[in-house]
A protein has these predicted regions:
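C-terminal and inter-domain tail/linker signature
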Residues: 2-176
Length: 176
């Protein structure tokens, strides 16, 4: 028997890589689902900044479309989020995003299925579905690939949003 105190090993303080990446994946996906695009697009950029590595690579189903680096991916994300935010906040677009985990068995790799429903004020709906594969390094995404993309419904048009002319205010007269 030893008189030296026993301390937990570092392995007890930090879960195994499989658990660590699964926990990070759940946190990232919950943050995405809970964010509200009609309120702010900046919330999504904050999530991206928190969870993605500086050297992240994002791709679609074809390898030629790989986008390297956080700055380039952030710009692409911004070009998607700003118009979506304007359509939701000003145009009355209803936006709902859902995620379902897909079981995996490799440490540092996660899979999920996504659904984005866009509903215009006209009632017209466009649904986008895709799957995501992520590689993690600790709590940071270092690679993300989107695949199995599907679109249901037709793209929404200007007529499906409420950007129409504003009714004149009663009692307000234009200057002559």
């Amino acid at each position: 028997m030893s008189d030296q105190p026993s301390f937990p090993s570092p392995d007890h303080l930090h879960p195994d890589p499989f658990t660590r990446s699964l926990t990070a994946e759940r946190s990232l996906n919950a943050a995405i689902v809970q964010a509200e695009i009609s309120r702010s697009f900046e919330e999504y950029l904050g999530i991206f900044d928190e969870f993605y590595a500086d050297d992240v690579e994002v791709s679609s189903e074809t390898p030629e479309e790989t986008i390297p680096g956080k700055a380039r991916v952030r710009l692409l994300l911004l070009n998607f989020l700003v118009p979506l935010h304007v359509m939701a906040e000003v145009g009355g677009l209803s936006v709902a995003i859902r995620e379902s985990p897909i079981p995996g068995d490799a440490a540092g790799e996660t899979y999920s299925s996504w659904r984005l429903d866009l509903v215009g004020v006209s009632g017209k709906t466009c649904t986008l579905k895709w799957r995501t594969f992520r590689k993690w390094n600790g709590s940071s995404v270092v690679m993300e690939r989107h695949y199995d993309q599907q679109i249901t419904g037709r793209p929404l048009t200007f007529d499906d949003l409420s950007f129409g002319a504003v009714d004149p205010v009663v009692g307000f007269q234009r200057p002559s």
